[in-house]
Amino acid sequence: MPHSDELDAGNVLAVENLNIAFMQDQQKIAAVRNLSFSLQRGETLAIVGESGSGKSVTALALMRLLEQAGGLVQCDKMLLQRRSREVIELSEQNAAQMRHVRGADMAMIFQEPMTSLNPVFTVGEQIAESIRLHQNASREEAMVEAKRMLDQVRIPEAQTILSRYPHQLSGGMRQRVMIAMALSCRPAVLIADEPTTALDVTIQAQILQLIKVLQKEMSMGVIFITHDMGVVAEIADRVLVMYQGEAVETGTVEQIFHAPQHPYTRALLAAVPQLGAMKGLDYPRRFPLISLEHPAKQAPPIEQKTVVDGEPVLRVRNLVTRFPLRSGLLNRVTREVHAVEKVSFDLWPGETLSLVGESGSGKSTTGRALLRLVESQGGEIIFNGQRIDTLSPGKLQALRRDIQFIFQDPYASLDPRQTIGDSIIEPLRVHGLLPGKDAAARVAWLLERVGLLPEHAWRYPHEFSGGQRQRICIARALALNPKVIIADEAVSALDVSIRGQIINLLLDLQRDFGIAYLFISHDMAVVERISHRVAVMYLGQIVEIGPRRAVFENPQHPYTRKLLAAVPVAEPSRQRPQRVLLSDDLPSNIHLRGEEVAAVSLQCVGPGHYVAQPQSEYAFMRR
């Protein structure tokens, strides 16, 4: 039955009275209630809200992916205009018909690329499969198009990436592959569920620009789900604000930002970290927290100095970490990924040193190398006056009491078969620090310290939200009273309010226990808020390092300026200068085996502020 008359002119999607529920303990739990919206051709609708507000399940309902997961979906109308201009009722399509709709007419970019990509197929095969299915292309034509899409999403060495498997790529690289796959068939509607959360600011800016270009070329409608209000201001035409499963406010992006009506919308905007908000301040400052009663209430600032004078707790000198690449009939090592090249820095007790840079710049590898989670090929790592890069495995285990790691994905770093109490107790058992009764009391204290309840110790990881799981990982890292915590993108996937709570918790713990943080992040607004010093990494080397205030208020290196210029601004009407993005020819950190990369030479430009010298910088960036 044709539905053309039911869809208003210009609309590509229309939803009326969408209700979504799930069964839990024989009770129906409502996830979305009476949601209605429309999407015009060529328009971007941003759906914003905190975790659990119903954003993602709405997207899954549109793709008809909820029913097989036990979701109960009811809707008066769910109309889609296909690329052929045929209008269909999505709720009436059977499974076979939806397979032709997904990918060709509606595509979705998921938040977690590792769970969305098939681990047994190469990246090229997975992108080509969609192209062959929906465009009737040959295998050769599909692979050529797959490489073109990888080039479009700014993946260097695209031809090499085609033959790699998902686990061989970084998180940011996998997300770009997902985006390339979704855009490869040029759908009528693109649903993007937190597509740039795991990406650094420059790649995020380029992806947003790419989506805009393709949207204009094809008059594609885009539903953009995000918690980043800077991205909303950057890309959205209209905004739909969701809270506890309901739409509480909708309007143009200018109306939402300049005249928000609902208390939750005002609270959400008040909690957005603004780049430049720390201007003139020397020390870290707490985030404001979302409050419906007091939307603009500011959390108490931290202005006291937490850095302890004396010797650094951690010294790194000329650290080198490379990964071999094999090729040829004999599978010999012919090339190497120069992940970290002659990196040096100090970390003082009570200090937060942030490592920033693009995906693939060597930030995470540097953090992992400090704990010997990856082997280094050169350099020195000195902790409390003792070299740890040459320690035996037995002595290294004892050292790990003092240096702990918080990983980006809390769900992947917690054993799903263990209660969270057992996960927190495990480090205490491994190091033989506390007997069972004392360990249980320690777990209860740690859970309370990170804002959870002692009775939560008996629950499993899947019973917690993302923010709660990250708190559990922090509690586990604190169990051994470490002197240093390495936090690798610990808050990048969390929404605004949860992120603020976690950052405030880290600052409180630093104040109380004098912990030193190596904070690895691509979120420049968060880095500005939490850091004492900042080190900027580019292709495995530090090109600028100094006090946070100096680096943010007076950036000297062109790469640092590019990172700051790429940060989205949560102000839709602000006239921003044209962004300075990286050149189209992205340098590669893959070199022939035995080839040495010229090390940058840093010169002092201010108190504690060092920048790569122009001549070595030029040679390095051109290699």
Curated annotation (Swiss-Prot):
- Could you provide one GO biological process annotation from this protein's UniProt record? glutathione transmembrane transport
Query: Where is ATP annotated to bind?
Result: 49-56, 357-364
**SMART domains in the record, alphabetically?**
AAA
What membrane topology was assigned to this protein in its record?
Peripheral membrane protein
- Provide this UniProt record's keywords sorted from A to Z: ATP-binding, Cell inner membrane, Cell membrane, Hydrolase, Membrane, Nucleotide-binding, Repeat, Translocase, Transport
Instruction: Tell me yes or no: is Ligase among this UniProt entry's keywords.
Output: no
Which GO CC annotations does the UniProt entry carry? Answer: ATP-binding cassette (ABC) transporter complex, substrate-binding subunit-containing; membrane; plasma membrane
- Enzyme class, first EC level, given as a word: translocase
Family matches, as InterPro entries:
AAA+_ATPase, ABC_transp_ATP-bind, ABC_transporter-like_ATP-bd, ABC_transporter-like_CS, Oligopep_ABC_C, P-loop_NTPase
Alphabetically, the GO molecular function entries are: ATP binding; ATP hydrolysis activity; ATPase-coupled transmembrane transporter activity; glutathione transmembrane transporter activity
Q: How is its activity regulated?
A: Inhibited by verapamil but not by carbonyl cyanide m-chlorophenylhydrazone (CCCP).
What is the name of this protein?
A: Glutathione import ATP-binding protein GsiA
Gene coding for it: gsiA
